């Protein structure tokens, strides 16, 4: 993760959260909308790292929760946070 020299502008991060797979859009756009403003620089770097990965890997990590041991620690922590956030959001009662 040290290869990330600068963080992307917020608008670019949000654009990159649009993945093309509905399942990934739900995870990334939902997490971005709910959490990005509160994220630390390290967490934003981890998100940027994840956004550079291929969709099949991201799907495996997020949807099927197959997070590899050799992934950088900040990325693993963020993936777990994204999974927990999505579960919490799914379980929240809808307001009509």
Go through each PLM region and give its residues.
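Positively charged, polar, low-complexity stretches
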Residues: 2-45, 49-96
């Amino acid at each position: 993760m040290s290869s990330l020299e600068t963080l992307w502008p917020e608008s670019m991060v949000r654009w990159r959260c649009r993945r093309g797979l509905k399942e990934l859009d739900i995870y990334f756009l939902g997490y971005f909308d709910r959490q990005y403003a509160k994220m630390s620089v390290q967490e934003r770097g981890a998100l940027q790292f994840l956004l550079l990965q291929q969709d099949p890997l991201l799907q495996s990590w997020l949807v099927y929760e197959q997070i590899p041991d050799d992934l950088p620690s900040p990325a693993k922590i963020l993936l777990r946070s994204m999974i927990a956030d999505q579960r919490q959001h799914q379980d929240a009662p809808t307001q009509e």
